[in-house]
Every structure is written in structure tokens, then in C-alpha cells.
């Protein structure tokens, strides 16, 4: 397999384009603090935060595929590329409405490899969390703000993991899935970055 094919496979398996949802709040908060110009912005903390958030998001995406296949949810979803009630103009683009990456079903990765990849992303996000912890201590001389940010990151991790993982499986509990997505991509990312 060529290098470009491997990149495309990685993008498909991880659903990398969807990480823009987690990057947007981080970039907004970073831009705000950078514009203030009163030493509240640290480029090193900002970069570490971006990578940590990306790794958490990718881990949640891959866990989502893992648990959806394991529980038979993806198999039951026959309207994977259903454009639903979209206007005719948008139907032409065959927008993905639901169903994850379908990477396991397409043979791009197997179920065990999916779990390993998700665990690897989460492990790496913890490593970045430690770097953020240390970097913030070097800048401020205090662990106070870092403990709050890491707590928020941990809550985000739990929401991402239990979005489709049993026994909680938020995505199938009448509105709790939507609430968890709102919390993870709204207040938690914004507060965690700040």
C-alpha cells in the first residue's frame, strides 16, 4: 500500500475531518487570549492543547466505531448515506448523516485493531495532558489551573467513551447523546482551553 493510500485510510478510520468541531472552540479561545496581549496566552500550552484535544477526539471517534460494530448498531443502520429530508441540491452531495466511518465493515481495520488504535489515541492524549500539566506549572508556578483543565478533559473523555460504550451508551438514551455532544464540544472545550 502506498503512502497516500495509508493517509487516506487513516483519515477514513479516524474520521479526521470531524475534528474541526473540537478545534473550533480551542482556536477561538486561543485567539481571544492571544489578542488580549497580557501574558495570558502561551503558544506552547496552546499547541499542546490542540494535540491533546485532537487525540481525545480521534480516540472517541474510533471507540464509537468499535462499540457500534461490537453492539451491532452499524449493521442495523441501513441508511448510512441516507440524505433524508434534505433539499435536492444537498442530496446531490450524498452527505453522510450517520453511521460512523464504516472502516471495519469495509475491511480497512478489524475490530481488535480498532480497540488498540482507540486506546493508543487515549494513552497519547494522557501524555499530552502531562506535558500541559508540566508546561503550565513552569509558566504559572501553580498546579491550580491545570487540575481544573485536566478534570474537564477527563469528563470529556468519559462523555466520548460512554457515548456508545455500555453500560451507559449515552447515544441511545433519549437526548442524552445530544446533550453529551453539546457539553463536550461547547462548554467543556471552551473552559478547558481557557
Q: Which sequence ranges carry the predicted segments?
A:
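The first (N-terminal) embedded transmembrane alpha-helix
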Residues: 13-33, 122-123
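Intramembrane alpha-helical segments
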Residues: 94, 99-194
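Aspartate-rich (DDxxD/NDxxD/DxxxD) Mg2+/diphosphate-binding motifs
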Residues: 56, 60-121
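Short, Lys/Arg-rich, polar N-terminal cytosolic tail immediately upstream
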Residues: 1-11
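Membrane-embedded alpha-helical segments that form the functional core of polytopic membrane enzymes
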Residues: 26-27, 38-63, 146-161
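Membrane-interface elements of multi-pass transporters and channels
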Residues: 34-39, 66-70, 74, 138, ...
Amino acid at each position: 500500500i502506498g503512502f497516500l493510500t495509508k493517509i487516506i485510510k487513516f483519515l477514513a478510520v479516524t474520521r479526521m475531518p470531524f475534528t474541526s468541531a473540537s478545534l473550533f472552540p480551542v482556536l477561538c479561545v486561543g485567539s481571544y487570549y492571544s489578542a488580549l496581549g497580557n501574558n495570558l496566552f502561551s503558544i506552547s500550552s496552546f499547541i499542546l492543547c490542540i494535540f491533546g484535544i485532537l487525540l481525545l477526539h480521534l480516540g472517541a471517534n474510533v471507540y464509537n466505531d468499535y462499540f457500534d460494530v461490537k453492539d451491532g448498531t452499524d449493521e442495523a443502520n441501513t441508511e448510512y448515506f441516507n440524505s433524508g429530508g434534505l433539499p435536492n441540491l444537498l442530496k446531490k452531495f450524498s452527505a453522510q448523516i450517520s453511521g460512523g466511518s464504516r472502516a471495519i465493515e469495509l475491511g480497512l481495520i478489524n475490530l481488535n485493531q480498532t480497540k488498540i488504535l482507540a486506546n493508543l489515541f487515549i494513552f497519547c492524549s494522557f501524555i499530552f495532558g502531562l506535558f500541559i500539566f508540566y508546561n503550565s506549572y513552569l509558566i504559572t508556578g501553580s498546579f491550580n489551573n491545570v487540575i481544573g483543565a485536566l478534570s474537564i478533559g477527563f469528563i470529556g473523555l468519559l462523555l466520548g467513551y460512554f457515548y456508545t460504550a455500555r453500560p451507559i451508551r449515552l447515544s441511545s438514551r433519549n437526548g442524552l447523546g445530544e446533550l453529551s455532544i453539546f457539553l463536550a464540544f461547547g462548554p467543556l472545550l471552551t473552559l478547558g482551553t481557557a
